[in-house]
Amino acid sequence: MDKSESTSVGRNRRRRPRRGSRSAPSSADANFRVLSQQLSRLNKTLAAGRPTINHPTFVGSERCRPGYTFTSITLKPPKIDRGSYYGKRLLLPDSVTEYDKKLVSRIQIRVNPLRKFDSTVWVTVRKVPASSDLSVAAISAMFADGASPVLVYQYAASGVQANNKLLYDLLAMRADIGDMRKYAVLVYSKDDALETDELVLHVDIEHQRIPTSGVLPV
């Protein structure tokens, strides 16, 4: 065997461990892919039950009270000038108001900022007289009297402020579905004009079960 053949054989011998070393990562990669797929399936399963801002559950992941369900309505405020106010009475569907004596336990407002939202808003819910025209002056006075909790919602770089819900408890008031027309959601645009494509409010009204609500989520 000449010198060149000896050198070639030596190189081949040195390469064998390298070929073996390449097979080990392939096996590890396969195991990693299997594990990744399992984790992905687990995340999807968990995400399906994880509450988000749009998830149709009352008060995040909390269930309704026994014997209760909820009806949701969506409000989209019109343009509100800087320092001005907006009010909208709670108008439930006829299929719900038909059972006007069913008790209401609580109202929750969930603030859903849209892509263009860059403002600061104050949100509350109040019982207002039937004679009230929800004028700017009337709404301003209701924000100032401190008689109702107020949610201050500000722009967040993440897209959703950590606290985006306001809960209004009505158990002690013995309010019923028929009373809901006496309540209104009020919005104050503090620092900037609120445009029509910046904000949506989801209002969840928890009330005693009615025959037509059997298919609603609880």
UniProtKB/Swiss-Prot annotation:
In this chain, where does the modification N-acetylmethionine occur?
M1
Say yes or no: keyword Acetylation present.
Answer: yes
Q: Name one GO cellular component term.
A: ribonucleoprotein complex
One Gene Ontology MF term:
structural molecule activity
Q: Where in the cell is it found?
A: Virion
Instruction: List keywords of the entry alphabetically.
Output: Acetylation, Capsid protein, Ribonucleoprotein, RNA-binding, T=3 icosahedral capsid protein, Viral nucleoprotein, Virion
Is DNA repair given among the entry's keywords?
A: no
Q: What is known of its domains?
A: The N-terminal arginine-rich stretch does not seem to be the major RNA-binding region that allows formation of an infectious ribonucleoprotein complex.
Recorded protein name is Capsid protein
Its lineage opens with: Viruses, Riboviria, Orthornavirae, Kitrinoviricota, Alsuviricetes
